[in-house]
Amino acid sequence: MDKYGLVLAGGGAKGIYQLGAWQALREIGVEFSIVVGVSVGSINGALIASDSFSEAKQLWEEASLDRGVSVARDLRNPEKLFSLKNIPVLLREVWKNGGIDASPTKDLLAEFIDEKKVRESGVDLGLITFSLTEYEPKEVFLRDIPEGQLLDYLLASSKVPGVSKIGPDDDKYLDGGVYDNTPVEMLLKNGYNRMIVIDISNMKGLAHKSVFNNSQIIYIRPNDIDDLGAAFDFSEEMFEKRFNMGYLDARKAFGLVSGRLFCFGKEVFREMIAKYGADACEQLEAFASETGVEKIKIYNKTDFMDALKAKYEEYKQQLAEEEKEQRFYSNILKKIPVSKDSNEYELAIEILEKN
């Protein structure tokens, strides 16, 4: 298999999604000639370039807001760090310490990223950061980074506004995602046209461009980025969810599983389309999503329909309790959550009623 270029978007704790995707790509046999990343994507990129999968898992298992930055204890809850009511507390931290001390992050990275191993891997590495001193982006490749300063450059690509200076020189740096959070152009400009993009954020950056050329680009990303949760949520529950989402979405991107909102074996989904029709299958997936059927697993037809019918029965019971005097079928069509069209799920309802 020919090697790909790899583009890794930034997105804080959502970066574990990229690790799950990487596991799937390793199983498929995908290899990379170059990896470019922004923010957490640059950190994952260094681990991927050096093929340090076990170290990457350990780093993410160790990662937390507590170990990532040094900040007042009452701000360490990810929901509190940037909340409006805590801005005065955050500003006091910045004023008192000259910024938020990011040195714990460097200590954490030093445990798991081996610069020598990265340099000897034969895989090129690139990152983007934004210089507040020069007010311009900096695209940097591994060959441009002095020996012993890789971690400083990775941190310079990942700067939260107000973070203390720990960059490669006297410049002040900001997260490179403000310029381009999905740096496809960085590869295209350097002659790479065959690439995989693992996207984990709705933020694109000031200079991001949509690519409309003959490049071969495979995108791996969730159907709904919001399913990845908050960028500072390092909880164990979200770790597992993001990892598994990345794994399944990568397999889907390479055609090993199928489905739009859910994951099915290729033959399973073909059989469902042959039996119910493409429009009905689209409705079944959408209805399953609306009613809360678990998405992060690979379904066969029986398991999927059983899970959907169970949710459908719960929904019928709820409607029956709320609208006992109305005709049930009519009520279903009118009461489907966030439905834009009263007939949006008509085919799905008919299938479920018959089964």
Regions found by a protein language model. Name each.
Residues M1-V38, A46-N355:
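Patatin-like phospholipase
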